[in-house]
Amino acid sequence: MAEEKTYPMTAEGLAKLQAELDDLITNKRPAITSRIQEARSFGDLSENSEYQSAKDEQAFVEGRVKQLQQMIQFAQVIDASSASKNVVTLGKKISFKEVPDGDEETYTIVGSAESDPLSGKISNDSPMGKALLDHKTGDKVEIPLPENHSVTVEILHVSKAK
């Protein structure tokens, strides 16, 4: 039997996935079912754009529900407090600057299921996340960029994410 993929994530990330799943099941599904029933009442389904739109949305929601159930079932919640204080691991907040004179940047390392770079959460599977993992405060780390370029950063601070 094939081994199931695990989804490393923080407790906060797991809670967000569970909240999204609950919303889809308790709110979205019933709303879509109502839309489908209403669209059916319009008659001929072959040229009924409201019906087709609702069915498309239903398929999307059902796919997302299955995806969330899979990720929640095989979630591996990482406790950042058990790791060494100054070492970059999943669930840690990290500040670094580009060497020699870059601006300071701060990110939290999270599992790919909860990654959101625009809000400062980078995946442990991203090139940056992979490069930073297991390094500590004061380390200089080379982060790969596209087209065989790279940038060197110095880790300034590592702490447990809030």
Curated annotation (Swiss-Prot):
Highest taxon above the source species: Bacteria
Database matches in Gene3D superfamilies: Transcription elongation factor, GreA/GreB, C-terminal domain, Transcription elongation factor, GreA/GreB, N-terminal domain
Residues covered by region (Disordered): 111-132
Record InterPro entries: GreA/GreB_C_sf, TF_GreA/GreB_CS, Tscrpt_elong_fac_GreA, Tscrpt_elong_fac_GreA/B, Tscrpt_elong_fac_GreA/B_C, Tscrpt_elong_fac_GreA/B_fam, Tscrpt_elong_fac_GreA/B_N, Tscrpt_elong_fac_GreA/B_N_sf
Listed GO MF terms: DNA binding; RNA polymerase binding
GO biological process: DNA-templated transcription elongation; regulation of DNA-templated transcription elongation
Entry keywords, A to Z: Coiled coil, DNA-binding, Transcription, Transcription regulation
PROSITE patterns (UniProt xref): GREAB_1 (PS00829), GREAB_2 (PS00830)
Keyword hit for Transcription: yes
Coiled-coil positions: 48-76
Function comment: Necessary for efficient RNA polymerase transcription elongation past template-encoded arresting sites. The arresting sites in DNA have the property of trapping a certain fraction of elongating RNA polymerases that pass through, resulting in locked ternary complexes. Cleavage of the nascent transcript by cleavage factors such as GreA or GreB allows the resumption of elongation from the new 3'terminus. GreA releases sequences of 2 to 3 nucleotides.
Family: Belongs to the GreA/GreB family.
Classification via PANTHER family: TRANSCRIPTION ELONGATION FACTOR GREA (PTHR30437:SF4)
Protein name: Transcription elongation factor GreA
Lineage, top ranks: Bacteria, Bacillati, Bacillota, Bacilli, Lactobacillales
Gene of this entry: greA
